[in-house]
A protein has these predicted regions:
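Hydrophobic faces of well-ordered beta-strands that scaffold small-molecule active sites
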Residues: 24-28, 64-66, 105-109, 158-162, ...
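Substrate-binding cleft and catalytic face of glycoside hydrolase catalytic domains
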Residues: 54-216, 222
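Active-site beta-loop-alpha junctions enriched in small/polar residues
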Residues: 29-31, 69-71, 110-114, 162-167, ...
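Acidic-and-aromatic substrate-binding clefts and catalytic sites of carbohydrate-active enzymes
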Residues: 34-47, 71-89, 167-170, 222-231, ...
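C-terminal outer-membrane/trafficking sorting elements
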Residues: 378-437
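Aromatic-rich peripheral "rim/lid" segments of glycoside hydrolase catalytic domains that contact
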Residues: 41, 179, 264, 268-275, ...
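Glycoside hydrolase catalytic-domain groove-lining segments
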Residues: 49-53, 57, 195, 206, ...
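Boundary/entry segment of secreted carbohydrate-active catalytic domains
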Residues: 20-55
Length: 437
């Protein structure tokens, strides 16, 4: 009787549309550097982690995000010390590893030589002096060439951000020529700045559709605390017929306010843009040493500790799971880890980041890491085989109810869909282990 119930439950999962697939993971744009500097990673029990990507797969994660700069060698020393270094060769190599490990890849175009965010969207040094059609053409060519090289390298992205936190536009002009900055404003802007911005986005998206037609396009903003601006932005995108798939948001409680504000914003987006999915493409919370420049202090709600960080992650996942339009969750800089580094002579960044998912002193995985996988429990058929074996070691059955082995021997099963004794779907890919959902 039990296996019949399990099979019946699984059948409902198998019939879910592909759009029900959820992506959960993090931005790991400095992973290769931490590995090269011999950072020491441990699981929550203190056991060494030999390879971090398979470990993430065993934790239930299925997607990773990488940022890309045009020419990060042009960044300032301070920016390089913050982690600006991801040129195309770097991203191709790490992207290939991510794809080979079975994860989906979110590629984050910054369209700048350094950080791009609401306060700065500096035009790459090599593009300075370009405007109008010439700038649109350069953006199109660059995007197309990058994606061609990513595909050739075995690192084709599944999701593409055409710009990072572009609430106020992109490609404003050279960093030191403030008079040339051309900002787009969804509220109170000019027709000229709107046309300039949306034509740039259209050029980038055109290249994405041509080279990676199956990839989904994300428009990334961070104004969720200002619902009128948030809706005005995406209203403008729809009014110009911009071809995109997903609304991407940043959400850091110490910058953007309480979870209730995000909850309300997600409800508004679902009502107003019912045809669009929403992803939280950046989030995080400190487990130690909250910086002094935060806008909102929630330490009384979520203490600055491992337990406080996990409480935030749990509440975030619970809230997001109530929104059917939310299909992605990415923790920013989750790989940050100073354990094992000689910080005075052999460091990756110039400052510790204490909102990642590893303890900088012990190298152990933070409790919040275990919270993320719960976001993916309703995933549909698009699961990935990203690990080597399934925890628990319980019985495994075919869809017909025939016992064929145990979770510990999942790697020896032929490719296919199976059921674990606790009712989870087990997807076995060719040449991989399995991941239970």
């Amino acid at each position: 009787m039990r296996i019949k119930i399990i099979i019946a439950a699984l059948a409902s999962v198998l019939l879910m549309p592909a759009s029900a697939h959820k992506y959960v993971g993090g931005d790991i744009s400095l992973l290769a550097d931490y590995e090269a500097h011999s950072a020491q990673y441990y699981d929550a029990s203190g056991q060494p982690i030999a390879r971090l990507l398979p470990f993430f797969g065993r934790q239930g994660l299925n997607a990773m995000r990488l940022r890309l700069f045009v020419d990060p060698s042009k960044a300032t020393d301070a920016e390089k010390g913050e982690g600006v270094k991801q040129d195309l060769d770097y991203v191709k190599a790490l992207g290939r590893r991510i794809k080979d490990a079975g994860f989906s890849l979110l590629l984050d175009f910054h369209y700048s030589d350094t950080w791009a965010d609401p306060a700065k969207q500096f035009t790459p040094d090599a593009w300075r002096g370009l405007s109008g059609d010439a700038l649109n053409e350069r953006l199109y060519d660059y995007t197309r060439n990058v994606l061609e090289e990513m595909v050739a390298a075995g690192a084709a992205p599944d999701l593409i951000q055409t710009g990072n936190e572009i609430s106020y536009g992109m490609l404003w002009g050279p960093r030191y020529d403030e008079g040339s900055w051309q900002r787009y404003y969804a509220v109170g802007g000019t027709e000229a700045t709107e046309k300039r911005f949306t034509s740039l986005l259209a050029s980038a998206i055109k290249a994405c559709r041509e080279i990676c037609p199956k990839a989904r396009i994300v428009l990334h903003t961070e104004r969720m605390a200002q619902p009128s601006y948030l809706t005005a932005f995406y209203d403008d995108m729809d009014a110009t017929g911009l071809d995109y798939d997903i609304i991407g948001l940043s959400y850091y409680p110490y910058h953007h306010g309480p979870l209730q504000s995000l909850d309300a914003a997600l409800t508004t987006l679902a009502e107003r843009f019912a045809d669009k999915e929403v992803m939280i493409v950046e989030t995080g919370y400190y487990h130690a040493w909250q910086p002094s420049d935060v806008y909102f202090d929630y330490s009384s709600v979520y203490p600055i500790s491992g337990a406080g960080q996990k409480a935030f992650a749990d509440d975030l996942v619970d809230m997001l799971s109530r929104h059917g339009n939310v299909t992605g969750l990415f923790w920013w800089f989750m790989e940050a880890n100073e354990c094992g580094l000689d910080w005075s002579t052999n460091r990756v960044t110039d400052n510790w980041y204490n909102a990642g998912l590893f303890d900088n002193q012990t190298g152990r995985a933070m409790p919040a890491l275990s919270s993320l996988a719960r976001f993916n429990v309703t995933a549909g058929m698009a699961g990935h085989a990203v690990g080597g074996g399934v925890g628990g070691g319980g019985p495994v059955y075919t869809l017909g109810g025939v016992r064929v082995g145990s979770g510990n021997g999942a790697g020896q099963l032929p490719p296919g869909i199976y059921v674990t004794s606790d009712g989870r779907k087990l997807s076995i890919g060719r040449g991989h282990g399995g991941v239970a959902e």
